[in-house]
From Swiss-Prot:
GO CC, any one term: cortical actin cytoskeleton
Protein name as annotated: Glia maturation factor gamma
Keyword Cell membrane: no
Alphabetized PANTHER family for the sequence: GLIA MATURATION FACTOR GAMMA, GLIAL FACTOR NATURATION FACTOR
Modified residues (N-acetylserine): S2
Source organism of the structure: Bos taurus
Any one GO BP annotation for this protein: actin filament debranching
Keywords recorded for this protein, A-Z: Acetylation, Growth factor
C-alpha cells in the first residue's frame, strides 16, 4: 500500500534534470539535492553540485531537515573496475517535524520511480554520509 501513497508530485523541470543527470558523461562525483516545496506540494531542485565528495556533500545537507539526493559516484571496485552508480539518498534526520517527515516519506517512492533508481539508501544523521558508508552500501551490488 505504501507504494501508492503519494504526497507530492515531482516538478517537471526536475524530472528533465534527473533524466539528463542519469546520462551524464562526466567522470567526477556529482549530486542533485532536492526538497519538498510545501506550498506547491512538489519535489523541486534545491541545488546541484559537481566534483563533490560524500564528505563535502554531507556539509551541504541541513542537519534538521529532510532532503533527497541523487548522487553519481565514481566507484572503484576491489578488482580495479570503475563504475558510476547513481545512488538515491534520503536524508531524514532525527528531530524533524513529523509533518515534514511524512511529506518526504510519502514522496520518496514516486521520486525513486521517476528517477528510475535501484540503489536507495537512507541516513538518519548527516554524519553518516561518508565515503566508507557509501562503499559499504554499494558493496552489496556486485
Amino acid at each position: 500500500m505504501s507504494d501508492s501513497l503519494v504526497v507530492c508530485e515531482v516538478d517537471p523541470e526536475l524530472k528533465e534534470k534527473l533524466r539528463k543527470f542519469r546520462f551524464r558523461k562526466e567522470t567526477d562525483n556529482a549530486a542533485i539535492v532536492m526538497k519538498v516545496d510545501k506550498d506547491r506540494q512538489m519535489v523541486v531542485l534545491e541545488e546541484e553540485f559537481q566534483n563533490i565528495s560524500p564528505e563535502e556533500l554531507k556539509m551541504e545537507l541541513p542537519e534538521r531537515q529532510p532532503r533527497f539526493v541523487v548522487y553519481s559516484y565514481k566507484y572503484v571496485h576491489a578488482d580495479g573496475r570503475v563504475s558510476y552508480p547513481l545512488c538515491f539518498i534520503f536524508s531524514s534526520p532525527v528531530g524533524c517535524k513529523p509533518e515534514q517527515q511524512m511529506m518526504y516519506a510519502g514522496s520518496k517512492n514516486r521520486l525513486v520511480q521517476t528517477a528510475e533508481l535501484t540503489k536507495v539508501f537512507e541516513i538518519r544523521t548527516t554524519d553518516d554520509l561518508t565515503e566508507a558508508w557509501l562503499k559499504e552500501k554499494l558493496s552489496f551490488f556486485r
